[in-house]
């Protein structure tokens, strides 16, 4: 695979510049945008022709290329998909992840049979390493590898970097530990995370012996201490037994509990632990709403929009059932077989013509008439942990109607409890119509209901275009709080804790031009 940056898009073709400064024309993909880093192989390349690549050599494009080549060489973007580090995770399932410089998982390999079993259910490609590890923990709990009792469960993470620079090694360790520790501490299970950096030689030895880097380093440590351990026993023994009484891989914040609080000022890493815990105290929760008392009114649709949709449904249905308007007897012909409403205003002689007309609706009494718009929403959460700082959404919307749908008329709502008032941010990471065509805003459920006091409303720009009957649009999105406090998703109305693939999900509602077309409101 090769890496390139998109510098021009024209219909079904895109011009990219490679790491070596070459121009290539490739087939355009859904969601492609200027400046995007993409992977391509020779099959994607369109043969050069005078009308295609030739225009790339204009002065303007050449100037852009100079910038991109500088970015490649100076910022090291050539490592975008190249493996920057190998990270082995030992729980009992042992799995190795290959990640790029941005901490995105590019590949994964099981290191034992349990790892193979869990990896089959893991969605890891192009996901953040921290999220994948949390998902691995969740799957390990599901299969009983992590016990939900007072027993300590050790997770050993070992990493080998392709870079020899100590600063990069330190940065990688700090980011991974800082991101994972709070998430693991918030789980309702006793987990101790340990972390070690392995050398390239140690990784090579671990590969030769088909064991994780962490366990190979435990083997080396045992041999240095004169213990007669074999690699076979290392592989079969639990981490809790192997590391009993050992401080191997213990993270700085765990080494000194609270014996000498003075040392927390001397060691910056220990001070970090002390600063993490205040975010959990109720003080911060009180401060946040105090900063923004106007927050309820600032919410995009604390407005009656949410209520208006609900109330609009019931009156409409209520007026169609009664016979207020004799013009519409055909809406419910089966409920009044005598067709009294039809003969009431017409001459009795024409009553014989009325039944003939009532037979026609029986062909399609419930079918949508021509031009009717309807959708179906399929969904899953990419992270099923009940407590997390980020809520992920994978959504697939299908046009089930018989008319084109202007996506700018479509709104989707995901309902949840905010738990503690804070500003929130929405991000669309990818969409089949382009992430830049997806919008997100937050609103209040008024009055709040069981499992729902807030919703995120997903919309689409005018540029998103039309969705034809039978076609679908996919998107990967997420939202979080700006103060990085946690969500408890366990009781959230729209949370899907059981699936890792698309399922029809009626707890996300879909509206077309403000009318509910899919789902059940809380």
UniProtKB/Swiss-Prot annotation:
Per the UniProt record, which residue ranges are transmembrane?
Answer: 52-72
Q: Where is this region: Disordered?
A: 311-371
Query: Which pairs of positions does the record mark as disulfide bonds?
Result: none
Q: Which GO terms describe its biological process?
A: carbohydrate metabolic process
| The keyword Cytoplasm is annotated on this UniProt entry | no
Write out the annotated subcellular location: Cell membrane
Domain RsgI N-terminal anti-sigma, by residue range, is 2-49
What switches on its expression? Up-regulated in pretreated yellow poplar (PYP)-grown cells.
Which InterPro entries does the entry mention?
Anti-sigma_RsgI_N, CBM2/CBM3_carb-bd_dom_sf, CBM3, CBM3_sf, RsgI_M
Question: What interactions and quaternary structure are annotated?
Answer: Interacts (via RsgI N-terminal anti-sigma domain) with SigI4.
Outline what the protein does. Anti-sigma factor for SigI4. Negatively regulates SigI4 activity through direct interaction. Binding of the polysaccharide substrate to the extracellular C-terminal sensing domain of RsgI4 may induce a conformational change in its N-terminal cytoplasmic region, leading to the release and activation of SigI4.
User: Domain comment, in the record's words?
Assistant: The CBM3 domain binds to cellulose.
Q: What is this protein called?
A: Anti-sigma-I factor RsgI4
Record organism = Acetivibrio thermocellus (strain ATCC 27405 / DSM 1237 / JCM 9322 / NBRC 103400 / NCIMB 10682 / NRRL B-4536 / VPI 7372)
């Amino acid at each position: 695979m090769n890496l390139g940056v998109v510098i021009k898009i024209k219909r079904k073709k895109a011009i990219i510049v490679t790491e070596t400064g070459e121009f290539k024309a490739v087939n355009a993909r859904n969601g492609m945008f200027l400046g995007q880093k993409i992977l391509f192989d020779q099959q994607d390349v369109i043969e050069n022709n005078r009308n295609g690549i030739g225009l790339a050599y204009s002065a303007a494009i050449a100037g852009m290329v100079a910038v991109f080549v500088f970015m490649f060489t100076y910022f090291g973007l050539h490592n975008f998909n190249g493996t920057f580090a190998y990270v082995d995770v030992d729980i009992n399932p042992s799995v190795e992840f290959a990640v790029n410089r941005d901490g995105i998982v590019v590949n994964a390999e099981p290191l034992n049979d349990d790892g193979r079993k869990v990896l089959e259910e893991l969605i890891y490609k192009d996901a953040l390493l921290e999220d994948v590890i949390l998902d691995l923990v969740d799957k390990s709990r599901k299969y009983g590898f992590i016990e939900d009792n007072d027993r300590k469960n050790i997770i050993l993470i070992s990493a080998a970097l392709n870079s020899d620079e100590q600063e990069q090694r330190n940065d990688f360790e700090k980011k991974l530990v800082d991101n994972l520790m709070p998430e693991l501490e918030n789980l309702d299970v006793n987990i101790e995370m340990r972390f070690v950096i392995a050398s390239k030689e140690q990784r090579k030895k671990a590969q030769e012996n088909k064991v994780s880097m962490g366990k190979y380093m435990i083997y080396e440590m045992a041999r240095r201490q004169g213990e007669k351990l074999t690699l076979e026993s290392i592989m079969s023994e639990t981490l809790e037994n192997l590391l009993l009484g050992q401080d191997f891989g213990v993270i700085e914040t765990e080494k000194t509990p609270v014996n000498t609080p003075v040392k927390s000022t001397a060691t910056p890493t220990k001070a970090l632990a002390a600063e993490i815990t205040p975010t959990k105290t109720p003080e911060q929760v009180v401060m946040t709403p105090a900063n923004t008392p106007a927050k309820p009114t600032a919410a995009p649709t604390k407005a009656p929009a949410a209520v208006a949709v609900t109330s609009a449904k019931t009156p409409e249905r209520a007026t169609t059932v009664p016979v207020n308007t004799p013009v519409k007897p055909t809406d419910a012909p089966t409920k009044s077989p005598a067709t009294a409403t039809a003969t009431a205003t017409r001459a009795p002689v024409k009553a014989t013509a009325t039944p003939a007309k009532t037979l026609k609706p029986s062909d399609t009494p419930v079918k949508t008439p021509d031009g009717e718009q309807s959708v179906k929403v399929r969904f899953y959460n990419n992270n099923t942990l009940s407590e997390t700082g980020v809520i992920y959404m994978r959504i697939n919307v299908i046009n089930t109607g018989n008319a084109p749908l202007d996506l700018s008329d479509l709104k989707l709502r995901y309902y949840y409890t905010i738990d503690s008032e804070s500003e929130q941010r929405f991000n669309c990471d990818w969409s089949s119509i382009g992430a830049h065509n997806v919008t997100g805003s937050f609103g209040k459920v008024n009055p709040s209901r069981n499992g729902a006091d807030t919703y995120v409303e997903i919309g689409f720009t005018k540029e998103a275009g039309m969705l034809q009957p039978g076609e679908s649009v996919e998107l990967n999105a997420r939202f979080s709080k700006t103060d990085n406090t946690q969500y408890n998703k366990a009781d959230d109305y729209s949370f899907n804790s059981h699936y890792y693939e698309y399922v029809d999900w009626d707890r996300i509602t879909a509206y077309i031009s403000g009318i509910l077309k899919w789902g059940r409101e809380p």
